[in-house]
Amino acid sequence: MNNVASPTLTVRRITTADNAAIARVIRQVSAEYGLTADKGYTVADPNLDELYQVYSQPGAAYWVVEQNGCVVGGGGVAPLSCSEPDICELQKMYFLPVIRGQGLAKKLALMALDHAREQGFKRCYLETTAFLREAIALYERLGFEHISEPLGCTGHVDCEVRMLKDL
């Protein structure tokens, strides 16, 4: 009988040392789905290489998923810019193919929503694209509802799917 070591998965808060690795994950997954910078997706965000600094702000948090010491995914939550103070945004949920289908996106989203509640947010907004069918299905299962108009000023002009959840 062969012994197969199962990969060690860890979900933890982002550190400054994770900036380059999570930016690579986001760029790789974005390229996989054709989510290019010219269309206003996350890869166009000027702070993509500084996520630790972004999510060190009040009310914000970001988690990375490590497999055997390598960053393979992440996601977070932050106050929604240009919006009511009780609305946060679920942001930058990206996972490499090697860890998809294991429930990590759900686990991370639930952690983010719990954090948002603890920070006093009453609603959580998100934007995504119809290309990400699995993500939309997850958000619907988590209680997010589709809304017609964007909230805040995210700059993600081609994210045509907008959702909101009461916390």
From Swiss-Prot:
Pfam families: Acetyltransf_1
CDD domains tied to this protein: NAT_SF (cd04301)
The keyword Acyltransferase belongs to this UniProt entry's keyword annotation: yes
Its EC number(s): 2.3.1.-
Keyword annotations of the record: Acyltransferase, Transferase
InterPro entries noted in UniProt: Acyl_CoA_acyltransferase, GNAT_dom, NAT_camello-type
Gene Ontology terms for molecular function: N-acetyltransferase activity
This protein's record includes keyword Transferase: yes
Similarity comment text for this entry: Belongs to the acetyltransferase family.
Full protein name: Uncharacterized N-acetyltransferase YjgM
